[in-house]
């Protein structure tokens, strides 16, 4: 009878074929595990063990002042359903907790989404309340979560991630996740972090110095789109540019 391998012009014994199959299996298994490991590394780029996670933006006056003004601008005490994309360890929710009356805070519903499992686990422990829901999920597949519309969407330094289609995602958020007369707060980083210190000026690829044309291009796109949808738009801040939009419909 024909043995394994004869169809390729040579004869291969059963034992040799089994060895080769075993080698191929090991290589495939190793490649698959390596792929899984790299995916976890990407997901945990801003996770609990990262340098970014140890940064406390709430202790930076340049961030805190502009963010609190944005919350005042949207009348945060009147909001009931708040969605935060790229929530990380939920620093933005902590400021809201400090700003509003305790009884009002308990009536608000908070939803946070982040790609980092360790960050989401931390946020859940930080806010173990019934009116908080946190999801470890890819923002590109937000529709899989079946979220109800929110009257405030917050996203700080997330939408410009290289893994996201900025313009399409932004328009999808306005059309499908924001209530008709809701508000939105977007934070665009115009800084970089060096040894835990906030340094003014965003670092762009292929430049050895701060170059901000891409930053302002994205900000202008959002501003123009929201104005067409009947929103009043303000731009504030320095190290973080805060785009705040409130409905005038």
Residue ranges and their predicted role:
Residues 197-223:
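Conserved Class I S-adenosyl-L-methionine
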Residues 181-190:
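Conserved beta-strand signature within the Rossmann-like core of class I S-adenosyl-L-methionine
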Residues 78-89:
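Conserved class I S-adenosyl-L-methionine
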Residues 89-105:
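Conserved SAM-binding loop of SAM-dependent methyltransferases across substrates and taxa
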Residues 9-76:
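Class I SAM-dependent methyltransferase Rossmann-like catalytic core
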Residues 144-153:
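A short acidic, Gly/Pro-enriched loop at the edge of an enzyme's catalytic core
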Residues 116-117:
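Conserved SAM/SAH-binding beta-strand->alpha-helix loop
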Residues 161-173:
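A short, conserved alpha-helix within the catalytic core of class I
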């Amino acid at each position: 009878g024909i043995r394994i391998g004869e169809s390729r012009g040579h004869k291969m014994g059963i034992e040799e074929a089994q060895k080769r199959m075993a080698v191929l299996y090991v290589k495939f298994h190793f490649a698959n595990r390596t792929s899984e490991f790299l995916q976890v590394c990407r997901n945990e780029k801003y996770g609990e063990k990262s340098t970014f996670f140890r940064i406390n933006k709430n202790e930076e006056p340049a961030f805190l002042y502009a963010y609190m003004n944005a919350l005042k601008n949207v009348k945060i005490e009147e909001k009931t359903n708040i969605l935060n994309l790229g929530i990380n360890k939920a620093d933005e929710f902590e400021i809201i907790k400090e700003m509003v009356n305790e009884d009002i805070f308990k009536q608000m519903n908070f939803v946070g989404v982040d790609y980092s499992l360790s960050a989401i686990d931390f946020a859940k422990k930080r806010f173990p309340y019934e009116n908080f829901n946190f999801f470890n999920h890819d923002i590109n597949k937000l529709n899989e979560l079946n979220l109800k519309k929110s009257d405030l969407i917050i996203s700080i330094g997330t939408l410009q991630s290289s893994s996201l289609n900025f313009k399409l995602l932004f328009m999808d958020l306005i059309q499908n996740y924001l209530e008709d007369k809701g508000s939105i707060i977007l934070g665009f980083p115009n800084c970089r972090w060096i040894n835990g210190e906030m340094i003014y000026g965003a670092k762009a690829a292929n430049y050895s110095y701060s170059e901000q044309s891409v930053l302002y291009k994205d900000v202008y796109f959002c501003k123009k789109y929201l104005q067409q949808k009947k929103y009043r738009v303000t731009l504030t801040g320095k190290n973080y540019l805060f785009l705040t939009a409130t409905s005038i419909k």
